[in-house]
């Protein structure tokens, strides 16, 4: 019983922190805006990975490096809905109709501000870099604009 109560409190805290106690209904986002976001976010993550690999990547195999590129794409997919909440606030604050450049700027800011180096260090130090599987290769081969995301906008 104590475990059940603890799980319920954990779930409530998670919901409170992730969605501020209200459901954000997904709406359509213009494809050009979505592409601008994805390209810039992944480019920022990949730039950070290249810098990290220059310093720490000597002991990693080629397959492990590919897996880390997949981690970048999966991280973007996983946190897409939260990015959209932040992006919607920024776009609403503009006070005008957004253009592709606004989404490009915000995507670049996300890619630059999220420091994935700590995550790479953790995966490497704990020997938790995922095994490279065919579905990872499929996502890595996709252009950043084609990486699927589930939350489509405001």
Curated annotation (Swiss-Prot):
It is found in: Cytoplasmic vesicle, Secretory vesicle, Acrosome lumen. GO terms for cellular component: acrosomal lumen. InterPro entries: Egg_lysin, Egg_lysin_sf. Keywords: Cytoplasmic vesicle, Fertilization, Signal. Monomer. Homodimer. Molecules associate into dimers and then rapidly dissociate again. Interacts (as a monomer) with the egg vitelline layer protein VERL (via VERL repeats); each VERL chain can bind multiple copies of lysin. Residues 1-18 form the signal peptide. Its main location: cytoplasm. This is Egg-lysin. It comes from Haliotis rufescens (California red abalone). The keyword Signal applies. It holds the Pfam family Egg_lysin. Creates a 3 um hole in the egg vitelline layer through which the sperm passes. Does not have enzyme activity. Species-specific interaction between the sperm protein lysin and the egg protein VERL exposes a basic surface on lysin that may dissociate the egg vitelline layer via electrostatic repulsion. Plays a role in ensuring species-specific fertilization. Sperm (at protein level). One of its GO terms (biological process) is single fertilization. Changing residue 119 to S: Impaired VERL binding.
């Amino acid at each position: 019983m104590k475990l059940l109560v603890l799980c319920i409190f954990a779930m409530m805290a998670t919901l409170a922190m992730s969605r501020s106690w209200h459901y954000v209904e997904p709406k359509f986002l213009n494809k050009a805006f979505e592409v601008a976001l994805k390209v810039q976010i992944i480019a920022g993550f990949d730039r950070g990975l290249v810098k990290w690999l220059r310093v720490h990547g000597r002991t990693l195999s080629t397959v492990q490096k590919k897996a880390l590129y997949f981690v970048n794409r999966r991280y973007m997919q996983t946190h897409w809905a939260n990015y959209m909440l932040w992006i919607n606030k920024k776009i609403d604050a503009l006070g005008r109709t957004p253009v592709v450049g606004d989404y490009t700027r915000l995507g670049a800011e996300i890619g630059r501000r999220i420091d994935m180096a700590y995550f790479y260090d953790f995966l490497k130090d704990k020997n938790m870099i995922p095994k490279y599987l065919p579905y990872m290769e499929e996502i890595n081969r996709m252009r950043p604009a084609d990486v699927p995301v589930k939350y489509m906008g405001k």
